[in-house]
Amino acid sequence: MLNSTGELEFSNEEDAEIISQLTSLALSDGKSSAGAPEKTGYPDSVYVMAANIFQGIRIEKSAQKVLIKYGNEPLRSFSESEDQSFQRLSYELAFSALKYQDILETILIDSCIFPSTTIPDRKFQTRVLSDNEESISEVQEVENLLNSFKIKLAAALARCRIKHDALSIYHILPETVRKQELRASTLPLYAWINTCKISPEEVYNNLKRRGYNKVKSVLHIDDKVFAVDQHCYDVLIFPSHLKNDLINIDLFKDYKLIFQDKSRSLAVHSVKALLNMDDDILMVNTGSWYTVAHMSILTNNNTSKVFVCGVQSQAKDPDLKTLFTKMGCKNIEILRETFINIESKDHRLQKVKVILPLPRCSGLGVSNPVEFILNEHEDTEFLKDHSQGGISVDKLHILAQQQYEQLTHAMKFTKAQAVVYCTCSVCPEENEAVVKKALEFQDLGNKVQLYRLSPPVLPLCSLKEIQLSTDKFFRMEPSEITNGCFLSILTRERDPSETVSVKDVLARAAAKGLLDGIELGKSSKREKKKKKSKTSLTKAATTDNGIQMKIAEFLNRETKASANLSETVTKPSLPQKNTAQVGASSQTRKHKLAPHPAVPTFMKNTCPSRPRERQTHFIRPRPEDRMVALKPIEIVLPPVFMPFSSPQGIRSRMPTQHLYCHWVAPKPLVPTCLPTPSLSRKGEKPKDDTRSSLLRPPRRWL
């Protein structure tokens, strides 16, 4: 009743029906804008469950602003509360009551009615109960009381709409809340394929047999259609109005298709892209167990383990094991400790290479908070922030600090090579600011390499996604086709000592029986090609060694011949280093050489005393010489001094000269040989005395 301070006080039994009527009003007035279906009432047990939920999440005001006092004792629950459909309806009722709490309290005070409620959608008609529905006396009593005050309630609602200049009660809500409801009405359903139990092609064929058609986009389509997600190959998209039809088919009953928000699929696919065959994964704050199962199924063909921390209650073990068994997950290991309490050197986590923290966040990127709470097991406090369209600065600071602590702790695991950080928030304080702060304050004392920001590993499917990812962060803004999310990948270079070759990976897989039917003994075409090239290189190296020996022998002969002809002291023969350089270049050149600026352009036969031997060598090569493919090469010999003058005199009068030789035979025996420049001069006869041409001093006027 009303007390001296003008406050209203009511019990929890009345509170239940208040929430019911409030929800009906919200759905009725807002159905044209948000697209919500018209509802004619719910079972009594749904009202009771919604009252208990509302009691825990309602907005408490200061003592000076309190208009209505709410009860503190929860109502007794019923067996139907375990049913998921009842839970969804109850959360929807409670969330609607929370959004309209201020308006309803104003209407209740203005109409002078004792219980806190609103106008029903049935226009004050009696609610019809089904035959198999059990009625609750407290709910019936409150409903009768509301019907008796219908005129006063209608007048109070009209005055409230005039005061706010609103067409309906829906338009009194903040604009952010209205946009959120509009997105939620068109948001499609996302479901990932359990590839341990069924292949994507089998799912497509099964759906087609049931009348579903595969399309590129399901937006604004009322038929039975589905599409494949562009970011995750194992995720299907369905229109939201098909959920009641889909949950009753065998694909969902047998855990072959699992409904889940797309942001979680993006996170596990990012982790999968960073894994090797035998790398383990550590997951933090997973929320829904479907996220763990999805990660396990993606790594089913590997030898990886999926560690999940923070499961403190052992009572959940039987249910979890049953769930994972039904889904075909075999590589999941649950840790009892919270993530912050796990040491970075824990012996169980020495093979963990990728850590996936999914910290608790504001979730302001989520369009349908009720579905998110039910699917991801979030706290009901999640609804309080969404009902107001924002979050307080103090609470945002607390969440950001928790996220920073989890991220920095993940970066302390020295064996880990990557951290995938994911939230469902659109607040920079929870996303970019946390990641940049963690990178800035890394522990420089560790000998391991530091983390750095890496670009997204997911495909960027539109120009907008490319623009949003220019700073190496993957973002998805809330829209009519998806919830908002944030994804960041931190990596560091792998330790070179831990680098594993492809052959080692295949050998491990074969030892564990993962490559049944695949012959590893057969070398691939690429390996054969490499072996062939190595063999040819070996043969070429052997041939080059033989050529080097022949060139060295030739140079020795030329040096001895020059020593016998000249009486002056000449320099030693070509050093071994030059010989090696000549051999490394392959063969002597057969074509005309570029003239050296300090040497006259005429051919020199440096061994005139043995012309017959040289002719025989070039005209009739040995069989093994024919097998060698000769290549042109330039040979530089040491300076040759004239016998009629001293070396000092020559050095003082002329620059250092070098001889450039071609391997050609003399003209009498090889008529096809190129003529020497000295013989090509007009009117000059060839000279048979090769020695005289060798000893002739250079003619500077040529």
Curated annotation (Swiss-Prot):
EC number, as in UniProt: 2.1.1.-
SUPFAM superfamilies: S-adenosyl-L-methionine-dependent methyltransferases
Class of enzymatic activity (EC top level): transferase
GO biological process: RNA methylation
Annotated InterPro entries: MeTrfase_RsmB-F_NOP2_cat, MeTrfase_RsmB-F_NOP2_dom, NSUN5_7_fdxn-like, NSUN7, SAM-dependent_MTases_sf
Keyword RNA-binding found: yes
Active site, renumbered: 424 (nucleophile)
Compositional bias per record (Basic and acidic residues), positions renumbered to this chain: 681-691
KW Methyltransferase (keyword) present: yes
Composition bias, Basic residues: 523-534
Keywords linked to the UniProt accession: Methyltransferase, RNA-binding, S-adenosyl-L-methionine, Transferase
Single annotated GO MF: RNA binding
Residue stretches of biased makeup (Polar residues): 567-587
Domain of life: Eukaryota
Residue ranges of the region described as Disordered: 522-541, 567-593, 675-702
Family listed: Belongs to the class I-like SAM-binding methyltransferase superfamily. RsmB/NOP family.
Function: May have S-adenosyl-L-methionine-dependent methyl-transferase activity.
Record protein name field: Putative methyltransferase NSUN7
Species for this entry: Macaca fascicularis (Crab-eating macaque)
